[in-house]
Amino acid sequence: MRHLYRSFCLLKSVTPLLGLIILATSCGKDPAVDPDTDGTVRIAKECTSGLKPVNIVITGDGFLEEDYATGGAFDQAANQAIDALFSVEPFKTYSAYFRVQTVTAYSEERGATLKNASTKTNTIFGVTLDGGSSTGMSGKDDKVFDYAKKAQGITATELKQTVVIVISNYVQYAGTTYSYSDGRSIAYIALSSGTSQLTRFGNVVVHEAGGHGFGRLADEY
């Protein structure tokens, strides 16, 4: 797994998780949405404690419009990611303080682009995998942030305290998190089919979104 810093960002000390949670003290309600529109926001997990939720936004790349149907391919992947993240500490204990929203982002084609491939897959965020034995991934960060700001309460300021997860509709053990010096972060995660503790999809979510994106932890290997 990889953790890269944008804008010449220096490694920060880890934000005290409990301190961040204490700052989170009322939670809003799910706004009315049009399920047939690109950029639709859904509340996948609402906070039940506090005035201000700790926000996570999940969107997808390489998913067609039909894949965003309720209970469809994207929902299944997003729910799996949410279940994995909140099954481990400290997210498990402080789960009530978190709000998780999903944002639909329609791609023209399923899948992702491999870095050295002769053809590119036409996806909304242009996610590209390094391929081979590398777990590296990248995408159009600015466009991802634009979609994340469609979510309830996610202003430009709040985005700096929000973890954004992009699930790539491509089966490979891969994931990379980009952390910016202003606090923003994006975790790109592919749909790993691995069965080992290291390579399974849920572990990649915890590692990238939880460890790198939220905790600002660096790899130790």
State the predicted function of each range.
Residues 1-10:
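N-terminal secretory signal peptides that target proteins for export/translocation
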Residues 9-19:
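Sec-dependent signal peptide hydrophobic core
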Residues 23-26:
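C-terminal motif of bacterial Sec signal peptides marking the signal peptidase cleavage site
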Residues 30-159, 169-170, 200:
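Propeptide-to-catalytic entry region of secreted or membrane-anchored zinc metalloproteases
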Residues 66-69, 110-112, 173-185, 214:
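Extracytoplasmic/secreted cell-surface and envelope-processing proteins
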Residues 157-171, 175-180:
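A cross-taxonomic marker for long C-terminal extensions/tails that follow the last structured domain
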Residues 184-206:
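Short pre-active-site segment immediately N-terminal to the catalytic Zn-binding motif
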Residues 203-220:
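Active-site recognition of the HExxH zinc-binding catalytic motif
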